[in-house]
Amino acid sequence: MNTVETSILTLAACAALAAVAEPADETATGRESPVRFDAGADFRLRQEIMDNLPGLPGGGPYAMTTTERAKYRNQMRFRPRAWFEVETGPLRLYARIADEFRYFPASNDPKKKRPYYFPDEVFLDNLYLDAQGLESPWLSAAGVESLDFRLGRQDMLGPNGSIFGLNRIVVEGTPTDGSRSFYSDMARTTLHFDETKQLDVFALYDSGRNDIRWGTSGSRGRSLNCINMTDSNDLDEWGGGLVYSQTALEGHLPFKLYSIFKRTEAHTKGSGANEIRVSPKEVTTLGVLLQPQFTENWGMEVEAAKQVGRICDGNREAGGHMAHVELRYMTDFLRAYKPTFSLATTYYSGDRHRTEPDDTDTAWDPMWGRYTQDSEMLVYGTLYENCWWSNMIYTKLKLTMKFGPRHGFYVYSGPMFAAVQDHLGRADHDGSTFKGVLSAARYDFPIRLAPKKATGFDRVEVFAHVVGELFNPGDYYDSSKPAYFFRWQVDFRF
C-alpha cells in the first residue's frame, strides 16, 4: 500500500471518529448533562518544494556546505490527528494524538533511510486540564476578578499566533520537527484583574526527545529542540515568565510588559572525534510591546527587548537585544476586504565573534520564537540552522486582505541585512552584511465551512492555501542563485 492510499484510509478513519462523537447537549429529560464529551480529528496534506537555499559555509558550529543547503527538496507531508475532551463544570480535560509521515517524490534512497517514512510514529501531542473564569473570595481580596489555568502538554501557538501575544518570543516548543507539533509541557495561570488588565504566569519544560510515542525504529530518539543538526537529543530547555497585559486610553493603547527566563541544558554536538560538549546557557528577556491604535485606519506596533544571561561554564556573557517597529494603514478603498498596508523593520542583534572558543554570545537568543516568523524557507538552514532568528535587520512592505472566514491574501517584500558581519555566509569569510531580498505571497481559501453548532458530518470543514517565496541572495552569501519555496496545502477538519 503506498503513502497516498494510506493517507486516504487515515482520512476515512478520522471521519468515522468524528461522526460518532457528537458533542453532548441535553439529556432526554431536558436537563443539561453534568458531563460533556466531544471528539474529532483533522488531517493535513501538503507538498513543499524548494531549491537553491544558501547555506552557512563560513565555519564554526553552523558550518554547512553550500551544496548540501542548495540541494533540491520535494516532500509531501501527511499529518493525521485525533482528539477528545471531557468537560464537567468549569473543568475540561483535553487530549490529542498525532502522527506525521512523509513521502519524497524525487528521492531514490531506500525507504528506511528517508526521514519520517511511513508509519513514522504516533505521539502524545496534547494532554492538559484547564478551567476558565474561576472565582473565590480570596482572589477578590487580592484584587483578582477571576482566574484561568491550564496544566499539562499544550501548544503555545494558537489560531492568532502566540497565546501570550508575543510572536517573536514565545510560540514554539518543538522547533526541530517543524509544524508537526508545537507543544510544551507547561503550567499556565492567567489572573484577570478587570476587563482591561491581566497577568499571565507560566513555567514550562521542553524535552529534547519525546518518549511517549509508538512507531518505527527510525523515529526513536528524534531530536525536537536541536539548534544544529548535529546536536544530540539531550538538548532540554526549561523556563518561565510573567506577561502583564493592559488596554489603556479607552482601548487605544494595548501594551504588554514581560520578563521571561530560559535555560538550555548542556548537550553534545557532533560525534566521535568531532564531538563537542556544549555548556548550559541561561537568558532572561525583559521587554515591552506597544500596539497603539491612533484612528480607525492607522495603527502601530512597537516592541523592544533586552536580554541578560550567561554561558554557565565560566559566566561568559550571553543574550542580545531586539527591536520591532511596524506602521499599519487600512485604506477605505475596497473597505469590505480590510486592505491593510504595513511597513515594518525587525532588528535582532548579532555577535561577530560568537563562533570563537571561550567567547561570549551576545547575539539575540530567539527563546521560544523558533518558527516561521518571516519565512517558511529560510528556517531550513540559512538562519544558523533550525529557526534561529538572530543577527538580522529585515524591512518589509506588506499588503493583507481578508475576504471572509479562512479566506485571505498577503504579499510582502523587502531587504534583509546581517546586524554585524559574522563571516558565516561565505567560505572565504568575506562579503558584506547584505543578505538579500526576501519576498512572499500566500492565498488562503475555504472549500467547505461548517455552520455554527453543527454536529456529526455537518461539521466537516475543508480549507486550503498556497504560498510561495523568493529569496535573492546578497553578498553575505557565497551563492547568487535565487532560492525559491512553494507549498500547497489542504486541511480536513471533523
Question: Predicted segment positions?
Answer:
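Outer-membrane beta-barrel "beta-signal"
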Residues: 445-447, 482-494
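Signature for the C-terminal beta-barrel architecture of outer-membrane proteins
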Residues: 23-36, 59, 132-149, 168-357, ...
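Flexible glycine-rich, low-complexity coil/linker segments exposed to the extracellular/periplasmic environment
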Residues: 354-391
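Surface-exposed loop and membrane-interface regions of Gram-negative outer-membrane beta-barrel proteins
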Residues: 58-78, 85-147, 164-173, 224-226, ...
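Substrate-binding cleft and catalytic face of glycoside hydrolase catalytic domains
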Residues: 94-106, 148-156, 161-162, 197-202, ...
